[in-house]
Amino acid sequence: MLNVADRQMILDLAAKYALKRVLLFGSAARRDTGYHDIDLAVEGVRPQDFFSLYGELLSRLSLPVDLIDLSRPSRFTQLVREEGVPIYG
């Protein structure tokens, strides 16, 4: 799971970018030992803000970040919606 500082930074950035929801998925959400990245899915990010948000997450969190936009429907985003752990919204 996320450490306290990373979680707070995600919450701060979610508010800054007026996100509707943030889900944690992947190994960090499953609480696997030794996870090496943070997989996040966001809903409500404006298309022109996606890469700014991604850059801030990459520079401010303690681990590398993978970010997906839930507004792009696919089997994968549906699975993330079903199995992701809500951390904002």
Range-by-range predicted roles:
Residues 1-23, 29-35, 43-89:
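Catalytic core of pol beta-like nucleotidyltransferases
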